[in-house]
């Protein structure tokens, strides 16, 4: 359990170090900016691997895995491959937040959920699918929101010549295209989450379920307006930040605010 906990902490530190990487690389400090990130990511992956040793022992003894445990094993493999790819593809940092977020989510489920809850989720496939889809959707939408803030910041600083162009910085058009793909992916995933969640709301009409449905739908509208505005109206800057932040706040209230009810 402690290995998994420290692995999650180092994954979070790695996520925090990805944003300054772009700024540091623009100032010619590419090696210095990569080293702290790589060390924290390496520590997270090693601790993640160690936390899976009991699962590997279960596999050797012929025991079956739960879906959560399989996801944890898959995520550490993906995280290791994506991190090593940083040395070959300079723009791989764009994918890493999604990879590390998936690792964090899988570790939380595999380590901290009680066996009773895991057994209940395994028996209810639709509920398990909905929860997994919801968590992944939130991760994608959250990363997309951080990405639009980073894009606006980079665009403004380049125009004001506060930072210099660098080979480590991808073209703004490429960054914007990647951002829009990620944002659109979040909107599609949120649509699927709302569709799958409708079934559970109809099965059990409770205040908590209605709270999640209403705020998730409002977030879907906010993200949808942002996507349409960027795609058809060419929105950039403040408008995109306002709608993106509004969407993630509404989604956060919908996903976690119901705990206060």
List each language-model region with its residue ranges.
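A generic, lipid-embedded transmembrane alpha helix
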Residues: 39-56, 78, 106-111
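N-terminal signal-anchor/start-transfer transmembrane helix
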Residues: 5-27, 143, 147
